[in-house]
Amino acid sequence: TSGKIELNGKEVTFHSPKDAIDMGIGMVHQHFMLIQPFTVTDNIILGVEPVKGLTVDKKTAREKVLELSERYNMKIDPDAKIEDISVGMQQRVEILKVLYRGADVLILDEPTASLTPQEIEGLMEIIQNLTADGKSIILITHKLKEITASSDQCTIIRQGKYIGTVKVADVNENDLAAMMVGRDVNFKVDKKEQEAGEVVLDVKDIHAKDYRGVEILNGLNISVRRGEIVGLAGV
């Protein structure tokens, strides 16, 4: 490897993720690293537990988690178990984890991949709250609408190579797409309507529960015809 990293005008070197965390850089991964039976607070303080005497100071930890949640309008219950909250709320717990450790630079890796449209809107509001408080955000995404809606600058990487950095206000989605793939992109798809054949798969009123007994499929119905493509949308 080669190159250099400067943080607040000073060149720095990281030998481990802990080095980056200690210098104020935190990462929220696409796949969360949370312990499902633990509470929100327990997950956030894991590894950096405040100690009072010979025991973990849960009261102080909970108060700090609640303060951070309220400051950035995350609306998180510090006592809730991870297994009982939504994917969007779990992501907020991951954000709180890095904030609890003092991060000023947050790297969000494909943060909207598993979110509903409403959760995406909530995440964008949280990002705006963070930047208004002086935090810096690196948003890694393939979704151009999110770049144009939330970012000030955009750096494009294609097959691991740096292509360029642009001010988002000066470009549109077509410009960004062309930089990403190296050619003009047509977002309009002309597809002829075709008649599908007979039903080859018919699924009716499927219900299923997870290991906790919580219903995860409720009345699922799918019919697939010969020569037909059926898409499933959801999180």
Place the predicted regions along the sequence by residue.
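Glycine-rich phosphate-binding loops of nucleotide-dependent enzymes
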Residues: 1-234
